[in-house]
Amino acid sequence: MTSPPTFERVMYVGLSVTDARRSSAWYADVLGFEVERENFGSTARPSDWDEVLMRHPHSGIRIGLLRHPSNNGAPFSEFRTGLDHVELEVASPRELERWRRRLDEAGVPHSGARDYLVTFRDPDNIQLELFCEPAR
């Protein structure tokens, strides 16, 4: 698989997931994030609380993947109150096309490059978008 393209903005997003290990593997393999810290049931948190803090090496964007004790395993839905989607900015239409190809290589279904946007979903059905500003 080719090396991951770049992001430009967003510092940290905390996402509730059903399986922090599975999600951290996906965010690493598909988007190129790296694990900074993991907490799987340490004494600092309840034993059923899992947390993985990840960082993208180029942009410095951080995500937290958190499995909460009260999560009953239901998939994400943007139709409930809370997060609708996460949008990451890329530098150019060319970089957006590189991302489309990378998603294809990883077997991740996506919208294809529509104008200046590609949308896809993570293992918990959270919608992610890659966007580049149109030339002015």
Predicted segments — roles?
Residues 63-66, 128-129:
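Conserved beta-strand in the GNAT
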Residues 22, 94-98:
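Short, conserved charged micro-motifs
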Residues 48-52, 84, 116-118:
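Short beta-strand micro-motifs in enzyme catalytic cores
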